[in-house]
């Protein structure tokens, strides 16, 4: 980075984060309601990868002459349930793998309404074998460098999304 920002300037940049939500993202009012409640800026935009990313609007005072999009550097892929990710790992595996191959280096898979324990105990409504499910989750993590965050209570998904991008940006600017 060319610039060294003061703490005050960093706060200004961080508070200007605008979350980008892919236009194909389904049922996510629990997330947008959180953003609205916390006055977090967001907008819908077609994303090439993932369901969420972010941008920083232009800020001439801080040397940012045009909007900065992080859509090719940092994304979140959200799955609403173990049933949804199970489908991605079985019937839609080829498509899912192609997406992950093309996705940015920094990404995370957010699985809502579930825990690792749910997979281990078979607490999901598909025929996907527990051992295969666990093997696929771990294989994808290492093969595609995609950490997995389980979010048993999806009420915290909005917080996770906002904080993930904030800390990516803080580390990016350091």
Where are these regions (language model features)?
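Conserved catalytic cores of phosphodiester-cleaving nucleases, focusing on short active-site segments
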Residues: 74-80
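Non-catalytic C-terminal interaction segments of nucleic acid-processing enzymes
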Residues: 1-71, 83-174
């Amino acid at each position: 980075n060319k610039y060294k920002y003061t703490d005050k300037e960093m706060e200004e940049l961080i508070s200007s984060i605008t979350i980008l939500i892919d236009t194909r993202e389904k049922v996510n009012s629990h997330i947008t309601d959180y953003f609205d409640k916390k006055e977090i800026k967001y907008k819908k935009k077609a994303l090439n990868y993932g369901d969420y990313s972010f941008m920083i609007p232009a800020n001439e005072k801080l040397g940012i002459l045009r909007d900065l999009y992080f859509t090719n550097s940092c994304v979140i892929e959200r799955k609403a349930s173990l049933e949804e990710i199970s489908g991605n790992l079985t019937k839609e595996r080829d498509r899912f793998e192609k997406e992950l191959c093309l996705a940015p280096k920094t990404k995370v898979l957010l699985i809502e309404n579930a825990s690792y324990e749910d997979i281990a105990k078979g607490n999901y409504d598909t025929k996907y074998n527990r051992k295969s499910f666990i093997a696929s989750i771990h294989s994808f993590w290492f093969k595609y460098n995609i950490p997995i965050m389980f979010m048993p209570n999806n009420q915290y998904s909005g917080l996770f999304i906002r904080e993930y991008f904030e800390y990516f940006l803080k580390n990016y600017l350091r």
